[in-house]
Amino acid sequence: MDIKLGKYKPTKEEYIKSFKDMLLLRRFEEKCGQLYGMGEIGGFCHLYIGQEAVISAIDMVKQKGDSTITSYRDHAHIILAGTEPKYVLAELMGRATGCSKGKGGSMHLFNVPNKFYGGHGIVGAQVPIGTGLAFVEKYNDTHNICFTFLGDGAVNQGQVYEAFNMAALWGLPVVYIIENNEYSMGTSVARSTFMRDLYKKGASFGIKGFQLDGMDFEEMYDGSKQAAEYVRENSFPLILEVKTYRYRGHSMSDPAKYRSKEEVEQYKERDPLVIIRKTILDNKYVTEADLKAIEQSVKEIVKEAVEFSENSPLPDEGELYTQVYC
């Protein structure tokens, strides 16, 4: 099986939905950055700004029953998995109404009913768990698959290769999505791994891999749909390396001095949100006024999330003793 781009193209409705989804993620993350600067959000906070086309496309090709797991840059993933933004923001602000009851914060978002299993703070630790989720699907013969996200830094973790081996050995239905945003914290891919084509990392286990442009929604949609079909039909893992870029630092505490302004601006010229907006207008899918209405609705959603979170109570002290295991 090879991914041959051009097989699938998003529908008019999917373009419009993706624009709204990506815009919501962008405005939500921008608001998170603002609230962090105001001291309303504490701890670590990793923003997804610039990478929205990746999760938007994956969400389009998911089927009901599929599961998702990712690392600590997880705000976008849980929102598109079906969690209302207000419950995500409440969690970031440490409120009892948050999706993890105010105890998980930015890096440990969960919504098990929606089959979103985190939000994991240890680099690469989610990969064996995602592999285990795929095992459950195979064991129960559900024909569901697990989308397991990891970053370019995680591919240097030993447990990732142990997971690859078991997934191939047992024929597990998992898509490993390597979100390669060029930097593992402040360390470039060129400085951290000899094999820079990360999609080839599973070759020794017989796992096929493909590289996609993560800044291009159309390519992401096409390639991701083919990848999901392959994994679902063959019950065998596959690796997608998506070349993407984060506009902000690794976290809110990172000034990102290890890269130039010119480099960042070069990627911003390929901003997926700008490109999909232009595509929609060029094809006359909707009017400028329609897009303005979408932008206003997104603004209201984010505003509601802020108001809800600010008016939500802090967790009761008794929560210190719940969900604690010895």
From Swiss-Prot:
- Read off the Pfam families from this record: E1_dh
Q: Which UniProt keywords apply?
A: Oxidoreductase, Pyruvate, Thiamine pyrophosphate
InterPro entries (UniProt xref)? DH_E1 (IPR001017), PDH_E1_Alpha_Subunit (IPR050642), Pyrv_DH_E1_asu_subgrp-y (IPR017597), THDP-binding (IPR029061)
Q: Report whether Oxidoreductase shows up as a keyword of the record.
A: yes
Task: Return one Gene Ontology term, BP aspect.
Answer: pyruvate decarboxylation to acetyl-CoA
The UniProt record lists the EC number as 1.2.4.1
Q: Which reaction does it catalyse?
A: N(6)-[(R)-lipoyl]-L-lysyl-[protein] + pyruvate + H(+) = N(6)-[(R)-S(8)-acetyldihydrolipoyl]-L-lysyl-[protein] + CO2
Q: Where are the bilayer-spanning segments?
A: none
Main EC class the enzyme belongs to:
oxidoreductase
The yes or no answer to whether the keyword Oxidoreductase is present is yes
The cofactors named for this UniProt entry are: thiamine diphosphate
| GO MF terms, alphabetically ordered | pyruvate dehydrogenase (acetyl-transferring) activity
Function summary: The pyruvate dehydrogenase complex catalyzes the overall conversion of pyruvate to acetyl-CoA and CO(2). It contains multiple copies of three enzymatic components: pyruvate dehydrogenase (E1), dihydrolipoamide acetyltransferase (E2) and lipoamide dehydrogenase (E3).
The name of this protein is: Pyruvate dehydrogenase E1 component subunit alpha
Lineage of source species: Bacteria, Pseudomonadati, Pseudomonadota, Alphaproteobacteria, Rickettsiales
Q: Which gene encodes it?
A: pdhA
